[in-house]
Amino acid sequence: MVIKLEFEFLLLLPLLIIVGFIVGILGSLFGIGGGFLVAPILTFIFDYFGIPDGVKFAVGTSLFVVFINSIISIFRHAKIKNINWKASITIGIISLVFSYFSGFLVVNFIDSAILKKLFGIFLIANAIYMAKSHHIDKISDREDKLEPFILCGVITGFLSGLFGIGGGIVIIPILAMAKYPVKRAVAISVGVIPLTSIGGLISYLTANTEGYIYNIGYVSIPIALIMAIPIIYSSKLGIKINQKISPKHLRIMLSSILGVMGLFMLL
């Protein structure tokens, strides 16, 4: 991808680093990949520089960052034995297939402007649900069942490839509806995101984008790496916060972030 190293772009470098740092914290804290934050900000950057198909580049690059973040987050959570591997693998395999399918649709058929608005509506709807779901704060535990995992895998995978997210912000509300406590949902979500994100990422990496440099398909390698480096360091902080924060505060924080980013995408 051609992005001239103008003064304006140099000013954006600190923003990319800061966002990467925040995404690393959020990834470990909520069991999410951070795509809901990365994709909107990259959409703004690519639109600002007049990059054709900016939303598709934002989604593809976001999935790459999400994948890196999720791998780091898995190692962090595995150390404290906070991953439900059985549930994660079940949801992850199903979501991988559907994320590849929806990623293929975006790359080949869906208009970028429509995609941006759909993403904003999706984030706001999730924010409203999480804000109103007081009941999940009091749930202590429940037995694993296959049905919610299958539903979760289908919906998560499809939306992941569509919007460039890892799926954590989809998994947690769906599991909350199935009466899983927030922290249990986080433990499941952490193991799902690498599989979900790689499914959609393949479609964007293999897309034909002739005429650009420094990219593979719809993935901007320089920007992805700039954002990924601080994630390595900040993800550890997210784990510490996760162990200390209450389910109620965890839910409220996630709802607030989703709402703000959703409005940002609709403006």
Swiss-Prot record:
Q: Which GO terms describe its cellular component?
A: plasma membrane
Q: Which residues form a coiled coil?
A: none
Task: Keywords in alphabetical order, please.
Answer: Cell membrane, Membrane, Transmembrane, Transmembrane helix, Transport
> Where in the cell?
Cell membrane
Q: Where are the transmembrane segments?
A: 10-30, 31-51, 55-75, 87-107, 158-178, 185-205, 213-233
> A Pfam family for this UniProt protein?
TauE
The record's listing under InterPro entries reads: TM_pro_TauE-like, TSUP/Inactive_protease-like
> How does this protein sit in the membrane?
Multi-pass membrane protein
**Top-rank lineage group of the source organism:** Archaea
Q: Family membership, please give it.
A: Belongs to the 4-toluene sulfonate uptake permease (TSUP) (TC 2.A.102) family.
Q: Which PANTHER family match?
A: MEMBRANE TRANSPORTER PROTEIN MJ0441-RELATED, MEMBRANE TRANSPORTER PROTEIN YJNA-RELATED
Name of the protein in question: Probable membrane transporter protein MJ0441
In its UniProt entry, the species of origin is given as Methanocaldococcus jannaschii (strain ATCC 43067 / DSM 2661 / JAL-1 / JCM 10045 / NBRC 100440) (Methanococcus jannaschii)
